[in-house]
């Protein structure tokens, strides 16, 4: 972490950061109001999450990321814009979902470009597994959306099979199909680089009925 990123923690964590407690969290209290909550897991450098919170003030945004420099960058960006609808956690996302997020509490969950763990022997480390998807589905409100995106075709195939097999979720594109990129996901720097290298991108948008 750079000195500037450490200063961001020191200056802005009290305003935007939520420390993991391992007990049910009142999201309305955390944000100071009652509004739909969008969760982004693994927000990287925070570029997308910052833009989403800035451009969509009617909803609240919670980001979870374990990478310190990315958290520091997002804290600086949020403070520079004076955002009030953004909160950040630096902890394992599965533990946060399991221990702190109530059933039906989320309007949307976004997992964009998670680590594909491309070697076969590492596939078990992939975040998107049946137990994870079932947990996320239980935290979505009726009509809530789970949106995944990846630029790794093998992982996309795996994701599609796992999501389509979850009885609590419906594929908005139809069973066995990928979704068009929805308007709320703008292109990331990582994605632009991938496209220049000829990589495809696959979006999956499933809704809890």
Go through the PLM ranges and name each one:
Residues 1-39, 47-56:
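S-adenosyl-L-methionine
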Residues 36-95:
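SAM cofactor-binding core of SAM-dependent methyltransferases
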Residues 109, 136-137, 146, 159:
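Class I S-adenosylmethionine-dependent transferase superfamily signal
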Residues 122, 149-165:
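Conserved class I S-adenosyl-L-methionine
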């Amino acid at each position: 972490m750079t000195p500037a990123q450490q200063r961001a923690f020191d200056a802005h964590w009290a305003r935007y950061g939520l420390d993991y407690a391992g007990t049910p969290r009142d999201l309305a209290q955390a944000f100071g109001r009652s509004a739909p909550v969008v969760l982004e897991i693994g927000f990287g450098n925070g570029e997308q999450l910052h833009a989403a919170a800035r451009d969509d003030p009617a909803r609240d945004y919670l980001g979870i990321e374990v990478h310190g420099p990315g958290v520091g960058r997002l804290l600086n960006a949020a403070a520079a814009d004076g955002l009030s609808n953004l909160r950040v956690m630096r902890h394992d996302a599965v533990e946060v979902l399991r221990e702190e997020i109530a059933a039906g509490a989320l309007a949307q969950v976004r997992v964009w470009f998670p680590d594909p763990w491309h070697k076969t022997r590492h596939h078990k480390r992939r975040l998107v597994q049946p137990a994870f998807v079932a947990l996320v589905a239980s935290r979505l409100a009726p009509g809530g959306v789970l949106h995944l995106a990846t630029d790794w075709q093998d992982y996309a195939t795996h994701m599609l099979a796992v999501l389509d097999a979850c009885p609590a979720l419906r594929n908005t594109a139809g069973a066995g199909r990928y979704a068009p990129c929805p308007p709320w996901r703008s292109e990331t720097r990582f994605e632009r680089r991938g496209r220049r290298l000829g990589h495809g991108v696959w979006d999956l948008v499933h809704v809890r009925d």
